[in-house]
UniProtKB/Swiss-Prot annotation:
Name used for this protein in its record: Rhodopsin
Record membrane topology: Multi-pass membrane protein
PTM annotation (Phosphothreonine): residues: T335, T336, T340, T342
Gene3D superfamilies referenced in this protein's UniProt entry, alphabetically: Rhodopsin 7-helix transmembrane proteins
Main location: membrane
Species this chain originates from: Sus scrofa
Coiled-coil segments on the chain, per record: none
């Protein structure tokens, strides 16, 4: 084995020279230079500074403007809540531990940080699944003129939380475990060891199949069908021009969210899968730290995409920030938006 395993940690560094110490008790500067830990702290600070205001503003603007409280927006707000979980439960902790060079909060703190980070990521993934299914049902109409209403949105929200908890909670109760990863300043699910005492191998397989592969298959199936249907409808002119434009724009926004999610999380998932399937292989702490950087950036891209691609939300946000006046001259009360005939979504 090219790493060092302890009772509740795995350090990707051989202890042949006797320098490895518990990441809960001692600085890990033998893994990387102190300035690299400082860079990690600076990155976490940037994510907090950007992630908290933009996600909080997304929630606040929606509360302030009744016109934004549409069923589809409930799912998008769920993404903002998930991102705030990551900001408060993950980024603030990693910022503090990076400044100290090790995970100062101990195994209990590691469990909490790993739980909130995993919960936030899974809520985001399953929210994208619900959005994909909504787009598929509304645009492709496999169930005739189905209308995505408030009850369906609430059921979708419940699904995201149930599935996220089904992934994040088991390591807290003995099925797998959370351990420090990368530079040992943040925690995640143990991909590094088989750990038969906590049936780690079965959990990792379960997580990759149920909480990563299946959601991606659903998403790609829905959008594959959706792209085909939109092209076919455009060719046959089955819908009005306004409806077609609205459906296309909402669909484009959600697809961009999915692509951004893959950019953020696919490197992390791929590296984690490689580590798990190559037990004991030689890899350094940076090997897992860099993909984690991409994953953590997920907290800021969803609201940015939504604000940039949704004119109605953008106008409402500017009105809120500018004390009731839109500097672009678009009167909130007279803002014209394109609503789809089936889903009542107002995209850009």
């Amino acid at each position: 084995m090219n790493g060092t395993e302890g009772p509740n940690f795995y350090v990707p560094f051989s202890n042949k020279t006797g320098v490895v110490r518990s990441p809960f008790e001692y600085p890990q500067y033998y893994l990387a230079e102190p300035w690299q830990f400082s860079m990690l702290a600076a990155y976490m600070f940037m994510l907090i500074v950007l992630g908290f205001p933009i996600n909080f503003l997304t929630l606040y603007v929606t509360v302030q403007h009744k016109k934004l409280r549409t069923p589809l927006n409930y799912i998008l707000l769920n993404l903002a809540v998930a991102d705030l979980f990551m900001v408060f439960g993950g980024f603030t902790t990693t910022l503090y531990t990076s400044l100290h060079g090790y995970f100062v909060f101990g195994p209990t703190g590691c469990n909490l940080e790993g739980f909130f980070a995993t919960l936030g990521g899974e809520i985001a993934l399953w929210s994208l699944v619900v959005l994909a299914i909504e787009r598929y049902v509304v645009v492709c109409k496999p169930m005739s003129n189905f209308r995505f209403g408030e009850n369906h949105a609430i059921m979708g929200l419940a699904l995201t939380w149930v599935m996220a908890l089904a992934c994040a909670a088991p390591p807290l109760v003995g099925w797998s475990r959370y351990i420090p990863e990368g530079l040992q300043c943040s925690c995640g699910i143990d991909y590094y060891t088989l750990k038969p005492e906590v049936n780690n191998e079965s959990f990792v397989i379960y997580m990759f199949v149920v909480h990563f592969s299946i959601p991606l298959v659903i998403i790609f199936f829905c959008y594959g069908q959706l792209v085909f249907t939109v092209k076919e409808a455009a060719a046959q002119q089955q819908e009005s021009a306004t409806t077609q434009k609205a459906e296309k724009e909402v669909t484009r926004m959600v697809i961009i969210m999915v692509v951004a999610f893959l950019i953020c999380w696919l490197p992390y998932a791929s590296v984690a899968f490689y580590i798990f399937t190559h037990q004991g292989s030689d890899f350094g702490p940076i090997f897992m730290t860099i993909p984690a950087f991409f994953a953590k950036s997920a907290s800021i891209y969803n609201p940015v995409i939504y604000i940039m691609m949704n004119k109605q939300f953008r106008n409402c946000m500017l009105t809120t920030l500018c004390c009731g006046k839109n500097p672009l001259g678009d009167d909130e009360a007279s803002t014209t938006t394109s609503k789809t005939e089936t889903s009542q979504v107002a995209p850009a």
